[in-house]
Design a protein with these regions (language model features):
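A short, conserved alpha-helix within the catalytic core of class I
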Residues: 158-173
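Glycine-rich SAM-binding Motif I of class I
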Residues: 89-93
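Conserved alpha-helix/loop element of class I SAM-dependent methyltransferases that forms part
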Residues: 58-77
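Conserved class I S-adenosyl-L-methionine
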Residues: 77-87
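Conserved beta-strand signature within the Rossmann-like core of class I S-adenosyl-L-methionine
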Residues: 177-189
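A conserved beta-strand element that flanks and buttresses the S-adenosyl-L-methionine
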Residues: 150
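Conserved SAM-binding loop
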Residues: 116-117
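Conserved SAM-binding motif I beta-strand of class I
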Residues: 102-107
């Protein structure tokens, strides 16, 4: 009983917070109360604030992805990180925490962008930032260089909405913007989604297509894991790359 009470008391409800932090916590919880928002990532909560609802999906595989990045890259050569399609910012926060990086997230959804910034304010975080932006070939060319870029589960959406040529141009430009790259995408073997048929160019072996595509761009494959998603029983290739 004492342990339960201690656990409850250790969570900060925000009642004694400065106004800026209270507003940030209120915003975070207002988003979490919205049933239309799907939590595909955990919420970074290092100070154990009291957050509404805990039914975040795929937490285990999200943390496994983060751990794979940390274990497969040599961070003696990595000081900066860009996460394209950062959602709730979890990869940005965890890599900045683990490796003391200058880390930036790019997110086109204004709600998720604001959510990530609220986490920054609430926890007094430094060396992390977020930008609200939909990536296009033109905007990609204007990006600064980063040591490591994460492009996770965005490629297939660009293919669907803007076409393969646009997605391919973005990928080729990103090659020039980084030294290390981590990639994951929806695959043609995931049937029944609005983007599935747009990926038919992947052919009968989506994992092989992803591998060969990255090699043809000029990357050296360092490591490939296969992780599940909330969408299907199948897995996606999670590929860690370096400039060859």
């Amino acid at each position: 009983m004492k342990k339960i009470v201690k656990s409850i008391m250790s969570r900060d409800s925000g009642s004694n917070l400065p106004l800026q932090k209270k507003m940030a916590l209120d915003y975070i919880n207002s988003v979490r109360k919205n049933s239309k928002v799907a939590f595909y990532q955990p919420t970074y909560n290092p100070n154990n604030f009291e957050l509404y609802r805990i039914n975040e999906v795929v937490r285990k595989t999200t943390d496994m992805r983060v751990d794979t990045i940390i274990s497969q890259f040599d961070f003696n050569f990595i000081n900066s990180y860009l996460d394209i399609g950062s959602q709730f910012g979890y990869f940005v926060f965890k890599l900045a925490e683990a490796k003391k990086l200058i880390a930036c997230g790019m997110e086109m959804d204004k709600v998720l962008y604001a959510y990530s910034n609220a986490i920054v304010i609430l926890n007094d975080l430094e060396n992390v930032s977020f930008v609200n932006c939909k990536l296009t070939p033109e905007k990609t060319k204007k990006l600064p260089k980063y040591d490591l870029i994460g492009f996770l589960n965005v490629f297939h959406h660009i293919v669907h909405f803007d076409g393969f040529d646009a997605a391919d141009e973005i990928m080729r430009t990103l090659f020039d913007k980084c030294n290390y790259f981590v990639f994951e995408t929806g695959q043609y073997d995931e049937k029944g989604y609005y983007w599935t048929e747009d990926l038919k160019f992947m052919g009968g072996d989506s994992n092989l297509w992803v591998r060969n595509y990255l090699i043809n761009l000029g990357y050296k494959i360092l490591h490939i894991e296969n992780f599940g998603t909330h969408l299907s029983e199948g897995t996606r290739s999670f590929v860690c790359c370096a400039k060859d």
